[in-house]
């Protein structure tokens, strides 16, 4: 019975990397996508509209990050996002940017652009090390 248990543990260790939801190919694709978003977001409106894409990439990347990286970016993101509430309860999606889809004053627009640039920089650093 012990050898069967040992065999099962070894099999699980060998199989578990294959079952991970975020593969190296996914990571590489997201790295290219972040670079593309930053490169193509030249005007203010495109930066504001691309913020949600950066947040989506961060959510996919989240499980593979160190605790320190998660806490750092979570703190930054939470300061600039609203909880999405449905009947007073957070939805499964969780959070959205405060800025997407709104008409912004010049001061708020500058703040939203700063958020995009800082978030993009933080996520890009995760890929480059």
UniProtKB/Swiss-Prot annotation:
Main location: secreted
A UniProt-annotated Pfam family: Turandot
GO process terms (BP): cellular response to heat; cellular response to mechanical stimulus; cellular response to oxidative stress; cellular response to UV; defense response to bacterium; innate immune response; response to bacterium; response to cold
Residues with glycosylation annotation: 49
The keyword Glycoprotein appears for this protein: yes
Function: A humoral factor that plays a role in stress tolerance; gives increased resistance to the lethal effects of bacterial challenge and stress. Regulated by the JAK/STAT pathway and NF-KB-like Relish pathway in the fat body, upd3 in the hemocytes and Mekk1 in response to septic injury and consequent immune response.
Signal sequence region: 1-21
Family of this protein: Belongs to the Turandot family.
Name this polypeptide is given: Protein Turandot A
Highest taxon of source: Eukaryota
Cellular component aspect of the GO annotation: extracellular space
Places the protein is found: Secreted
Organism field: Drosophila yakuba
Keyword tags: Antibiotic, Antimicrobial, Glycoprotein, Immunity, Innate immunity, Secreted, Signal
